[in-house]
UniProtKB/Swiss-Prot annotation:
Residues 276-300 have a biased composition (Low complexity). GO terms for cellular component: centriolar satellite; cytoplasm; microtubule. It is found in: Cytoplasm, Cytoskeleton; Cytoplasm, Cytoskeleton, Microtubule organizing center, Centrosome, Centriolar satellite. This is Tubulin polyglutamylase complex subunit 2. Subunit of the tubulin polyglutamylase complex (TPGC). The complex mediates cilia and flagella polyglutamylation which is essential for their biogenesis and motility. It comes from Homo sapiens (Human).
Amino acid sequence: MEEEASSPGLGCSKPHLEKLTLGITRILESSPGVTEVTIIEKPPAERHMISSWEQKNNCVMPEDVKNFYLMTNGFHMTWSVKLDEHIIPLGSMAINSISKLTQLTQSSMYSLPNAPTLADLEDDTHEASDDQPEKPHFDSRSVIFELDSCNGSGKVCLVYKSGKPALAEDTEIWFLDRALYWHFLTDTFTAYYRLLITHLGLPQWQYAFTSYGISPQAKQWFSMYKPITYNTNLLTEETDSFVNKLDPSKVFKSKNKIVIPKKKGPVQPAGGQKGPSGPSGPSTSSTSKSSSGSGNPTRK
């Protein structure tokens, strides 16, 4: 089966690609600095391939996953940015083909003979709560399949939570980070696919759904190319620590505030205060105190 890389301009002339990418091809192509928006076209999977996968793994594939594979046997879309005449690969959106939708096992995670087993790394102290579902297990309680290797930054997984034989309604999508901690993403594959597309495949975007968030470098890219339906709360506090922002209106306002006290200084000659030097001295010290105080809230 042949796979064909589509050049940027082909997205608009191929309706099935436009439908598959939910129209973000045109959004990316119109973004400043974005270049080489490429989709690797894959033929649809045949129904017998899905049936064979289900029989081999003793799992019923969810209906939305089936429909996806009947449209395209996997998905891979990339885009780059041009900075100072250098082209840097940036965005990557991928879903494994059926043949690569393989189960995560001990051998697939570790190859060293004396490495700890996945059972040794189980953390049962953080089980299901009101706001967080029960985490997947590496033993027979869960069946885990890799949807995307995330370019080495983790693994997005289709998780059957009831073991084998596994039913389609028992699936969820989880992110396994490099430290082998689990993070819930979505209840369904369709919901995850929307997240993947709307986050534009930005580096480490899955970490936005973890307690420790995305890295400082990833925040820079998120600020330049904001995801389409991004939760701004994830960026509001921490982004200011890493991205320098210059607001001209605020700069000029602060200058005006410095000028105004100097004009008012001589108008208040009243009692008990030290002459004209009084207003300028305290105001500068208070200004320095406030500025030093405001420079400390950022923490690493």
